[in-house]
Regions:
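Sec/Tat signal peptide C-region and signal peptidase I cleavage site
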Residues: 5-11
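Extracytoplasmic substrate-binding proteins
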Residues: 11-14, 21, 110-189, 218, ...
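Short helix-initiation/N-cap motifs at beta->coil->alpha
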Residues: 17-19, 75-87, 214-225
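Short, solvent-exposed loop/turn elements at domain surfaces
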Residues: 22-24, 39-44, 59-63, 99, ...
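Structural recognition of the beta-strand scaffold that forms the well-ordered cores
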Residues: 32-34, 51-54, 96-100, 122-125, ...
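A short, structured surface patch at a secondary-structure boundary
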Residues: 38-92, 96-105, 206-209
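Alpha-helical, coiled-coil/dimerization segments enriched in small aliphatic residues
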Residues: 79, 193-219
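A ligand-binding cleft/hinge motif common to bilobed small-molecule-binding domains
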Residues: 103-117, 239-254
Length: 330
């Protein structure tokens, strides 16, 4: 997709993932991604090129992120989070914007108008599903001159997709567990099975018990405890630690099969959520984690070692065994 601009050492023409031809500086030193999708991918591929952050990382997350990130200024975003500060973009010397395109969010005229107003060249990178991520990773690797690093990530991602798919394929549909996705501190918000927020359920056998058409991109569909009980989930995967801490002692939940069987699992979320909100490259590790939880015999990997390997490859962080225990609390 990328082609150097002949005769000009200071600039090159590239074609972004929406087919737009863009002229960008060849010697990139300051790059900014004004959305969580792109910002998180920059954490992985080229944290040294980042000119700023969308928001300040939580203190609990900082030790698991590239060290230079914590000193960067907060610039804001386009379409998510606080609006980007044009003056800060200029002050930081930002040379290129990485704009992530993910379904079902279209790139609107308002968005492009905001981007054009900055006067900074921008490229669109497109990936929604995990299957689309390796191509986006390789694209960014070429764009940012990080080909070797990006290739290692893309190959790891592809291997995870292939290995987990092979494990899931060994299990007959009738033997696949029914899974309820508990969101919110009460556990009574969830996602329809067609939501982008539950792609990991699709990849592990389409196991989401809440079969419906999602009412909005934001999701968080409200549900009653009675409905959860009717679903008879074998497993509950939860976002909130407060819910997991109380579910085994809350009388109202004691008749739910997953609770009876002690199969309620808290999704790891340090430094980025492994599952959702926002969906990021961390979902590859989340896919391994979930496949191992649902099919421990078919996907009998050592999640602690996989976690160390993944954080090393994608975040450049070497985790101790104690770090892994802290991250993978369940």
């Amino acid at each position: 997709m990328l082609a150097a601009m002949a005769g000009q050492a200071y600039a090159r023409d590239v074609v972004d993932m929406m087919g737009r031809k863009v002229t960008i500086p060849d010697d990139l030193k300051k790059v900014y991604a004004p959305s969580p999708y792109g910002a998180y991918m920059m954490y992985a591929i080229a944290p040294d090129l980042m000119s700023g952050l969308m928001f300040v990382p939580k203190d609990t997350d900082k030790k698991y992120l590239p060290k230079n990130l914590t000193d960067l200024p907060v610039i804001g975003g386009v379409g998510a989070g606080p609006n980007a500060n044009p003056e800060m973009l200029l002050k930081t010397g930002t040379q290129l914007l990485i704009v992530w395109r993910a379904e079902p969010n279209p790139i609107t005229e308002q968005t492009t108008a905001l981007l054009d107003k900055t006067g900074i060249p921008y490229v669109f990178v497109s990936a929604t599903t995990l299957e689309e991520y390796p191509a986006a990773i390789r694209y960014l690797g070429t764009l940012l001159h990080r080909e070797n690093r990006a290739e290692k990530m893309a190959q790891m991602a592809e291997k995870i997709l292939a290995d987990t798919a092979a494990a899931v394929a060994k299990v007959p549909d009738a033997q696949k567990p029914k899974v309820y996705y508990a969101e919110g501190v009460d556990g009574l918000s969830t996602e329809c099975n067609d939501s982008i927020h539950v792609q990991l359920f699709k990849l592990t056998g389409d196991v989401d018990v809440h079969r419906c058409h999602t009412s909005s991109h934001m999701g968080m569909e409200k549900i009653s405890l009675e409905q959860v009980m009717m679903y008879k989930p074998d497993v509950i995967v939860a976002q909130e630690s407060m819910f997991v801490q109380k579910v085994y002692t809350d009388p109202a939940w004691q008749d739910v099969k997953a609770v009876k069987d002690h199969r309620v699992y808290l999704i790891p979320r340090v430094p980025l959520n492994w599952f959702d909100r926002p969906p990021s490259f961390m979902r590859f590790l989340g896919l391994e984690w979930l496949t191992n939880k649902l099919y421990p015999n078919q996907y009998a990997v050592d999640i602690a070692k996989e976690t160390q390997r993944f954080y090393s490859t994608f975040l450049g962080i070497d985790l101790s065994d104690a770090d892994v225990r802290e991250i993978v609390a369940q």
